[in-house]
Amino acid sequence: METQSNEIINENKGNEIQSESRLTIMEATSIIVGHGVGAGILAVPYLASRAPWWDFLWILAIAYSINLLLHLMIAELSLNNNGAQFVKCFENELFTGRFKKIATWIVFAFLAFSVLCNVASFITGSAAVFTSWFNLPSWVGMLIYYVIAGLVVFFGMKIVGICEKYSVIAMVIVIGILFVATVTSKMNALPSTFIAASNSMALYSTVAFSLSAVMSVPQVVKGVAGDRKKIISAIAAGTGINAFLIVVVTFMTLLGAGQAITKNGALVDLSVSLGGWVSIVGYIFSLLALSTSFWANTLNMRDIIAEQTKWNLKLCWLLATLPCLILALCGMTSFVGFARLAGIIQVLTGIGIIIAYSRSRKRVNQSLICGRFGQLPFQLIVILGSIMATVGSVIAVK
């Protein structure tokens, strides 16, 4: 059965998944962390302050479990299609007939727009750091950041994996410094008042978005050559590290800032309670978080373009990054606006991903990664989680 499935998956391609380079477990894990960690993690404390602290813990546990299932299903979908990206998976599993190509390019357009909005938000946010540090015009900060961050992806997946690895280590160190400063200062009581169910829904949505690294899963599958154990380990560890960072940042902010938490972000609130030096450390964390997300998203988009067009990787890199810079320079919306729009699109595409996964699972007649946890009841749970996250992203917070 396994031999027959491999023949279907790798028809005329051979059994080995093709990739520009191989990733170590740490590098693959860091790509998952890098894609997930970002602006969302800094928004969680505000929403957590609007609910009892124990609600935050069970919401995080549910969001982590559903996201882990989703990521493993995506990994299996990609593995069943020889390490393909989302668009090619959709083309293989969902679309048939004369409208197949049209439907494929529509999906490509939606995913490209999602990445475009995401990366534009990273450029906008990072430029704000350069503007604050060096008093530069915003557009100059954007150009500087684009050149520095973009070159990492230009040199390929292996360099991205290495940079992600050391950036994740640096982020953990920065969070550790802030945590020690928080627990050695005057601490506030944790929130214990229930306000509204809508707040819990909004909190779930933000936590789910902060844990999401779905677009980077195919890179992991390709980077570890389809090794089942390495795929599962990298995804579980990557989402686990993101969950750990969310817990530390959230409780650190709740203890340090108390009920004075605002929508400005966790590090802004901490700087008010702990002192201005937190702003400097916070800027470093923000740059690292935004850069890891920039690398993961643009690497993914580069590969999607290359997969669909068969063009040179360097040209695909330019097509994946330059429009994001142009959109950021145009200033069509704010940093939060970019991220929110991209989040809604990304969550909605999750439903299509699960349908494609279900069809690929039936086609190959086996489940190398998810096993019984990939069966229909669990697929429905993941779809329900995606719907909840979508509703929570637009619901009013009280």
Question: Could you describe each region identified by the protein language model?
Answer:
Residues 20, 139-144, 237-245, 250-264, ...:
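Loop-to-transmembrane helix boundary motifs in multi-pass membrane proteins
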Residues 45-52, 124-138, 158-167, 265-290, ...:
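Transmembrane helix-loop boundary segments of multi-pass membrane transporters
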Residues 15-27, 52-60, 73-118, 131-138, ...:
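Transmembrane-helix boundary/entry motifs in multi-pass membrane transporters
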Residues 12-19, 138-144, 148, 156-158, ...:
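Helix-loop-helix junctions that connect adjacent transmembrane segments
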Residues 1-46, 51, 68-72, 226, ...:
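Membrane-interface "cap" regions at the ends of multi-pass membrane proteins
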Residues 29-35, 104-112, 131-156, 171-179, ...:
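Transmembrane alpha-helical segments of multi-pass small-molecule transport proteins
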Residues 88-98, 122-142, 222-227, 233-244, ...:
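Helix-loop-helix connectors at the membrane interface of multi-pass transporters/channels
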Residues 174-178, 288-297, 317-323, 342-367:
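Hydrophobic alpha-helical segments of multi-pass membrane transport proteins
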